[in-house]
Amino acid sequence: MDESNSQFEKRKRDHIRIALDPRSQTDGQNGLDSITLIHEALPDLNFKEVDISTSFFFSGESIPLSSPIFISSMTAGHEKGREINEALARLSDRRQILMGVGSQRRELEDSNAAEEWARVRKQAPKARLLGNIGIAQLIKSPIDKIRRLIDSTEAVALFVHLNPLQEALQPEGTTDFKNGLAAIENLVKLAGVPVIVKETGCGFSVDTLKRLSSTGIYGVDVSGKGGTHWGRVEGYRSEESDMLYHVAQTFANWGISTKQSMLNAIDARVEYQLWASGGVRNGLEIGKLMALGASKVGVAKPFLEAALQGDEALEKLLTQLETELKVTMFCTGSRNLKDLQSKKVIQ
């Protein structure tokens, strides 16, 4: 179903409003509470030596990053979203972390929408941005249009998000996912930047992770259940008298947890990079996911909340997350991220 610009902007405003509503959250369902990291009472290192720096490496180019934490995709394509993205991009610029932008779907049909990123880039010329398009749009769009999305953000990589539940529950949803695997494979060949496939809060099965191995993608962000549930978000956009409201209630806890999605990736023995997100709320959870094999870990809702408060709140949040990660590493005897990923720290 086609929608006007005003309808699109209202939908995106609804998404922000409802994503901040506790009813949209599957708190406590990411599975990470059941993981215990082994405490090291006598770490052979100085806390000041703990190093959380990393990089984004592709085709011989290495982009330095201050930490493995990335800002997970939330919103784009409307005035409030622009303000949020400007604040997040400034943080990415200042602190050298990756930032996933919200869906760039609108830019496929509205060339003026790309101006949002030109304004963002003026404020944050060194922001490390990750472009973002949905699989349903990728399937139907010529590759030159997708490349324009990448160019508009000057993205270092492109997320392709998979969101079947959200699309099925969205009145304006696009639910034709046929030939999606072939579309991803074609994109990998022609995009010119790394392609990372992500879910949007419902996670991945072993089978899907194995199927993606044939496409040549750079990585997968498992984006499991445990945080903002976009099925719930779409349900709460509907009136209680609407059928879709009640259908969404049926699927309010649908999905594979973040922890289980990571375990599924281990079982699938994938060779592409594993990133993780989905209900991540603190640096200890980031450490747990790194120990499970994640090379980057995304945080969404906390960054959205902080962005609405301003730059100082964003700085405080990121500093806290990074400090919690460092404490996790110190107390497991991990000098750097490689140590954390390679040690048997899971009990």
UniProtKB/Swiss-Prot annotation:
InterPro entries assigned: Aldolase_TIM (IPR013785), FMN-dep_DH (IPR000262), IPdP_isomerase (IPR011179)
Cited Pfam families: FMN_dh
Any one GO cellular component localisation term in the record: cytoplasm
Transmembrane feature ranges: none
HAMAP family referenced in this protein's UniProt entry, alphabetically: Idi_2
Function: Involved in the biosynthesis of isoprenoids. Catalyzes the 1,3-allylic rearrangement of the homoallylic substrate isopentenyl (IPP) to its allylic isomer, dimethylallyl diphosphate (DMAPP).
Protein name: Isopentenyl-diphosphate delta-isomerase
Source species of the chain: Bdellovibrio bacteriovorus (strain ATCC 15356 / DSM 50701 / NCIMB 9529 / HD100)
